[in-house]
Amino acid sequence: MAVPGVGLLTRLNLCARRRTRVQRPIVRLLSCPGTVAKDLRRDEQPSGSVETGFEDKIPKRRFSEMQNERREQAQRTVLIHCPEKISENKFLKYLSQFGPINNHFFYESFGLYAVVEFCQKESIGSLQNGTHTPSTAMETAIPFRSRFFNLKLKNQTSERSRVRSSNQLPRSNKQLFELLCYAESIDDQLNTLLKEFQLTEENTKLRYLTCSLIEDMAAAYFPDCIVRPFGSSVNTFGKLGCDLDMFLDLDETRNLSAHKISGNFLMEFQVKNVPSERIATQKILSVLGECLDHFGPGCVGVQKILNARCPLVRFSHQASGFQCDLTTNNRIALTSSELLYIYGALDSRVRALVFSVRCWARAHSLTSSIPGAWITNFSLTMMVIFFLQRRSPPILPTLDSLKTLADAEDKCVIEGNNCTFVRDLSRIKPSQNTETLELLLKEFFEYFGNFAFDKNSINIRQGREQNKPDSSPLYIQNPFETSLNISKNVSQSQLQKFVDLARESAWILQQEDTDRPSISSNRPWGLVSLLLPSAPNRKSFTKKKSNKFAIETVKNLLESLKGNRTENFTKTSGKRTISTQT
């Protein structure tokens, strides 16, 4: 989907580099005394430094450790719908009677909400015991005990102050482009884009809390189950405003029921059986969908999409503002998230390049939120990883090389698919490649603008081009389910559009090397120029490139042809366009 309002750049004078910095919105975490919230204010990070500005965003720890820590944190957290005007100090004082508070923040989504993390899980029980079910004269409330509360004031007029809330959405396009035009270099632009689009600490906490609230409901049917987030919410490539993908993990329930042999007796649970795992999945999701629809506070627009290849329940969690997709036992997707988490943590340039390529694709409608023949963000991410594996020296290791570093603890086979790779980041040697982001962005467009898509596939497991196993226009091998093509949906016309835009973008960046605008110029430059809609002069560039290619083709044909038909052929051959290959 194209960036809304991106066309405003053709009319607004946004790119004059200001002497005064653009004012950034306040984004903060409110912490109780003694709590350090060092990594939560985006505006305190230097906009041009990947090394110091973003390294602490990707901790050098295992994915499983991060997941467990976040989940435990979410279990000690409550979500409270608050009045618009509320005294923050009185609010905290009231909640502190139930137990010490670790930290909290406010945000807005169909009202004002507070996310409050207690130091101990037992404090939530105390708060629930002091809470009552609302009653109205006209309607009957369905009693449901959860960690989602509604706070009312007995005296509305006594509170006059407003709390400052954290930002859960990216900046407007105008603000973003002003920041990008102010940057000192293209590298600085890519880093700024990353900082503005990446998930904040607050947003990440809210995502895990939402999963934890859904888990509470699912646990009524399946004790010891876990609702795990996966995809962009956890792989460090998520953008503010992205959907929340989650799956119901029943493996813990199965593990608890593992056979425990005691003498001659073997005890089993009485269960119901169904013909296949797919039918079991459909029945489980059907029940959970009904539960969310009828009893889930804040869950609206529930859709049970049970006949899809991967059955799911889709709903909006109104309180958090997230569009959610719930599946079951999707462990391969979680493993893919872990792999991307590792790649994003290995080199600070990876995420900056991925975010910029995705933004570029969205600005030119190469990607869309609507399913169809478009390239997906996941496919673009795989293409960036593959490109970085192909650099000399490589910036990222291949999946096969990560597999060779794995030990017995890392061994993982899911549904017959080998998903083994090293999980310990400290065992992976950092790259010796020192190329700039500006060079990598330009080389990315040149590489895929000239890639032999008609013959070769993209394979991050081996990090090299391979012959395509079928005739799909774009073939990107699934890293774990290796017989699948993750880009099978992409049409030839969409691929050709990608190639044409990649070539054009490479040319624009090449021109930046020789014709970079002065500080006083108001002309869009660098990354901003790549996000502009095609202008007449840029269309003429594409046409000139096409004509040049056609002229060279005709010239070669003329040399091999004889007779009076040569002249007539010359007049009609100029319409030929650039093919996918060069």
From Swiss-Prot:
> What Gene Ontology biological process does one annotation of this record name?
mRNA processing
Annotated residues that bind ATP are located at: 107-109, 241-242
A Pfam entry, by short name: PAP_assoc
Cofactor requirement: Mg(2+); Mn(2+)
Q: Which domain of life is it from?
A: Eukaryota
- Give the EC class as a word: transferase
Disease / disorder: Spastic ataxia 4, autosomal recessive: A slowly progressive neurodegenerative disease characterized by cerebellar ataxia, spastic paraparesis, dysarthria, and optic atrophy.
Write down what this protein is called: Poly(A) RNA polymerase, mitochondrial
Source organism of this protein record: Homo sapiens (Human)
